Amino acid sequence: MDKSKRSFLKSKRSVRRRLPPIQSGDLIDYRNMSLISRFISEQGKILSRRVNRLTLKQQRLITVAIKQARILSLLPFLNNEKQFERTESTARTTGLRTRNK
């Protein structure tokens, strides 16, 4: 190939496959808190399949396990560890009008 055609070819990058998040020996159970907590967001929401990189069956089992743990009070429904600071709302104060009588 001459030099002009060579610049258009894409370089082949090696594709690194990530390890599956659930190994074959892992037990998907509502009591396995170390496993379940990996699939919950900071806000306490169940992460999607695309984010987790799980199969459909694994995602269903994780979802059921998380819901069982929530019902049995092993997991909170909402994660309230973050204390949200309430700041003054500037939109409300600037939008007020005074009525002239």
Swiss-Prot record:
Name used for this protein in its record: Small ribosomal subunit protein bS18c
Q: Which GO terms describe its biological process?
A: translation
Keyword annotations for this protein, in alphabetical order, are:
Chloroplast, Plastid, Ribonucleoprotein, Ribosomal protein, RNA-binding, rRNA-binding
Subunit-level organization: Part of the 30S ribosomal subunit.
Principal localization reads: plastid
Matches recorded under HAMAP family = Ribosomal_bS18
**Record-linked NCBIfam families:** S18 (TIGR00165)
What InterPro entries does the record tag this protein with?
Ribosomal_bS18 (IPR001648), Ribosomal_bS18_CS (IPR018275), Ribosomal_bS18_sf (IPR036870)
Q: State any GO CC term.
A: mitochondrial small ribosomal subunit
- Alphabetized Pfam families for the sequence: Ribosomal_S18 (PF01084)
Q: Which family does it belong to?
A: Belongs to the bacterial ribosomal protein bS18 family.
- Localization, UniProt: Plastid, Chloroplast
UniProt feature coiled coil, ranges: none
Gene encoding this polypeptide?
rps18
Could you state a single Gene Ontology molecular function term? structural constituent of ribosome
